[in-house]
């Protein structure tokens, strides 16, 4: 297909226009008084959300050059979501501001490479200061972090209780409830870091995950490549009329293609994953999963082979959720006594080992077996509200986990304002000269934008609020919910520092790339080609 090119300033301006369109769509959602965005869906009801990354994923622009800019801004939101799980709107607003200010300097003749270097040095200084200013999460602050992210005090309390019970490394999953109530249920379950072997296994295309309800579970220690060995068991599973979940060292060749074909045709709802761990540890982890689900590990060591076993070796679980990276098994059918015996065995091993590495791995396995899983059942009056609520609670779980990892800073955009002092004090920033030194001003002007938009969305004059907060002492800022200037940490208006730092770094990364772009290459729209084709004689 023919390509079209754009160069120099025109190229950068197109990228900026695309970033602006996406950022302007997203930034109306920022803050406690932020508005919602309605997303049209090809099937079913529209989605209403205030989650930056969900909105960003839906944006595709007509102009191919502007669309490149929008996709770059989308990358900022997606990357921030992957690392911290929240802060996607903040990241997009910061990227927009850095690009806008930076391009102004480049258009005036500044060297893009120097501007890029200045932005990177300044952002690192601010990110380091944010970490210095962070505090550990204490008591009720867990509920505050969750409540701010989900914009609901009720959800905040629920998540504080969930993390209190499963611990900061514990697994929390989110399911849809058949009632209008949102509640927390603690269940037996475990999570391990292996995802589906093929994207064809996905059952929920929007969330890119495979969900099996009331599934049979086959645990095979070796590889499965021959269909001949595997077919008898597959046919028995088909007759049982239940979904099938397979864990094996690997599944390849005709065995994998048969599973995929059956899945696509709808003959058998099946998902396959690789076994977690390596060597002897893999064997032990498979035994843990077998204990939890009431399965038997199919292994020649135990005299069991795939072609000779029946349904008696399969375990079951109420629900299994598989993403591209993780598998979560909830409510396995293993008996409480078997699980308790296995936990006791692991504890005994733990007391016998001297190796720190072994201890760490045994602790992990213990936590997975004994810790259980917190299941939040989300209820709402309508399907549209249910989806929107689920998005908010997912954000809140990620935010809370981030806060427990690296600590918290004052929220509402004020932490970035207070961290600006680092630009006056950092030796690395002071050493910058020429165009690189001019980039410090770009970062200074960009970092006030999140606060400005939080205030603006709440109906206040953003510039006035920014000027006022700049004069306040550390941890004090503007509470957009009440319209007061106060100690935000005491008021429970807090952000996980990991979220703020990820947002800042990802925004700077994309902005630096846009500023140093000279040429864009995009596909020519099909209509244009057709129009030219008609004039050939």
UniProtKB/Swiss-Prot annotation:
It comes from the Bacteria. The keyword Nucleotide-binding applies. ATP binds at residues 29-32, 86-90, 412, 495. Keywords: ATP-binding, Chaperone, Cytoplasm, Isomerase, Nucleotide-binding. It catalyses: ATP + H2O + a folded polypeptide = ADP + phosphate + an unfolded polypeptide. It holds the Pfam family Cpn60_TCP1. Its main location: cytoplasm. Its EC number is 5.6.1.7. One of its GO terms (cellular component) is cytoplasm. The keyword rRNA processing does not apply. It is found in: Cytoplasm. One of its GO terms (biological process) is protein refolding. Belongs to the chaperonin (HSP60) family. Together with its co-chaperonin GroES, plays an essential role in assisting protein folding. The GroEL-GroES system forms a nano-cage that allows encapsulation of the non-native substrate proteins and provides a physical environment optimized to promote and accelerate protein folding. PANTHER family: 60 KDA HEAT SHOCK PROTEIN, MITOCHONDRIAL. This is Chaperonin GroEL 2. The gene is groEL2.
């Amino acid at each position: 297909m023919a390509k079209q090119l754009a160069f120099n300033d025109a190229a950068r301006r197109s990228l900026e226009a695309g970033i602006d369109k996406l950022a302007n769509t997203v930034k109306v959602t920022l803050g406690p008084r932020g508005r919602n965005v309605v997303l049209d869906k090809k099937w079913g009801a529209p989605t209403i959300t205030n989650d930056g990354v969900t909105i960003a994923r839906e944006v595709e622009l007509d102009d191919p050059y502007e669309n490149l800019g929008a996709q770059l801004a989308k990358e900022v939101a997606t990357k921030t979501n992957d690392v911290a799980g929240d802060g996607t709107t903040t990241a997009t607003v910061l990227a927009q501001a850095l690009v806008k200010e930076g391009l102004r300097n480049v258009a005036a003749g500044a060297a893009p490479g120097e501007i890029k270097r200045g932005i990177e040095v300044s952002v690192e200084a601010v990110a380091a200061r944010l970490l210095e200013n962070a505090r550990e999460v204490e008591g009720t602050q867990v509920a505050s972090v969750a409540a701010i992210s989900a914009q609901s005090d009720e959800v905040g309390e629920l998540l504080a209780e969930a993390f209190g019970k499963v611990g900061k490394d514990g697994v929390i999953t989110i399911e849809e409830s058949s009632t209008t109530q949102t509640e927390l249920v603690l269940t037996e379950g475990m999570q391990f870091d292996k995802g589906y072997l093929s994207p064809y296994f996905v059952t929920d295309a929007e969330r890119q995950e495979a969900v099996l309800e009331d599934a049979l579970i086959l645990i095979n220690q070796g590889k499965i490549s021959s269909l001949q060995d595997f077919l008898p068991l597959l046919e028995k599973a088909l007759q049982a009329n239940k979904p099938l979940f397979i864990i094996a060292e690997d599944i390849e060749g005709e065995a994998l293609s048969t599973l995929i074909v059956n899945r696509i045709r709808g003959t058998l709802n099946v998902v396959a994953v690789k076994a977690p761990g390596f060597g002897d540890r893999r064997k032990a982890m498979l035994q843990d999963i077998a204990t939890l689900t009431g399965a038997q590990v199919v292994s020649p060591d135990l005299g069991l082979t795939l072609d000779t076993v029946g349904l008696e070796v399969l375990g079951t679980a109420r629900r299994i959720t598989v993403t591209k990276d993780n598998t979560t098994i909830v409510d396995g059918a293993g008996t409480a006594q078997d699980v308790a015996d296995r936990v006791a065995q692991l504890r005994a091993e733990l007391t016998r080992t001297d190796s720190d590495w072994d201890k760490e791995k045994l602790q992990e396995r213990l936590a997975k077996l004994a810790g259980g899983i917190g299941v939040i059942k989300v209820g709402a009056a309508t399907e549209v509200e249910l989806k929107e609520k689920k998005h908010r609670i997912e954000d809140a779980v990620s935010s809370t986990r981030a806060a427990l990892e690296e600590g918290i800073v004052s929220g509402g955009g004020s932490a970035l304002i207070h961290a600006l002092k680092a630009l006056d004090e950092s030796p690395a920033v002071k050493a910058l000269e020429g165009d690189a030194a001019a980039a410090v001003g770009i970062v200074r002007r960009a970092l006030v934008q999140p606060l400005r938009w939080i205030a603006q969305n709440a109906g206040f004059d953003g510039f006035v609020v920014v000027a006022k907060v700049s004069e306040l002492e550390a941890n004090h800022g503007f509470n957009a919910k009440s319209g007061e200037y106060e100690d935000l940490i005491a008021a429970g208006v807090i952000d996980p520092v990991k979220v703020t730092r990820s947002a800042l770094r990802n925004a700077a990364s994309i902005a630096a790339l846009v500023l140093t772009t000279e040429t864009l290459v995009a596909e020519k729209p099909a209509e244009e080609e057709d129009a030219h084709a008609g004039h050939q004689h």
